[in-house]
């Protein structure tokens, strides 16, 4: 699987060419140093049997952003649901002792829109869940 890293490589190149600096990117719980902070099902079943190569590619995607020189923010949602927006969004940068919880796709979308113009989130990797 190279979908995420290929798309990120092309996006970063296009941004450099166009002089665009800001990128907010969604990867997922289990990418990079968030591995081990998901639910039991995510960590023991999905990551072992179904998503191993996908998350290896998400790791490559994140590494590209870290070295891109862009003003990036990586957002790693917890377990995504199709439920309604709740308005609850816990944002974490430190994961010690944390297990990600559920969050609706609507709440993630609302959070993404909110941080696009937030310079404090530049070069931050954030775990978001419903708390």
Predicted segment positions?
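NAD(P)-cofactor binding segment of oxidoreductase domains
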Residues: 1-23, 60
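Alpha-helical membrane-targeting segments
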Residues: 37-53, 97-99
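SDR active-site strand-loop-helix element
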Residues: 23-29, 75-77
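Conserved beta-loop-beta element that borders a ligand/cofactor-binding pocket
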Residues: 62-84
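Conserved catalytic-site region of short-chain dehydrogenase/reductase
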Residues: 29-35, 80-83
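Mid/C-terminal beta-alpha module of Rossmann-like enzyme folds, strongest
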Residues: 18-21, 94-131
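Glycine/proline-rich active-site loop of Rossmann-fold NAD(P)-dependent oxidoreductases
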Residues: 33, 84-89, 115-124
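NAD(P)-dependent short-chain dehydrogenase/reductase
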Residues: 79-95
């Amino acid at each position: 699987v190279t979908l995420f890293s290929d798309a990120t490589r092309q996006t970063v190149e296009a941004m450099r060419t166009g002089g665009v600096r800001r990128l907010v990117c969604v990867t997922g719980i289990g990418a990079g140093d968030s591995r081990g902070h998901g639910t039991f099902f995510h960590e023991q079943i999905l990551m072992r049997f179904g998503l191993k190569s996908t998350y290896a590619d998400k790791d490559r995607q994140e590494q590209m952003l870290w070295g891109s020189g862009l003003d990036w923010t990586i957002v790693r949602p917890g377990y995504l649901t199709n439920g309604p927006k709740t308005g609850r969004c816990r944002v974490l940068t430190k994961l010690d002792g944390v297990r990600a919880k559920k969050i609706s796709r609507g709440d993630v979308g609302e959070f993404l829109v909110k941080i696009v113009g937030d310079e404090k989130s530049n070069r931050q990797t954030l775990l978001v869940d419903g708390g």
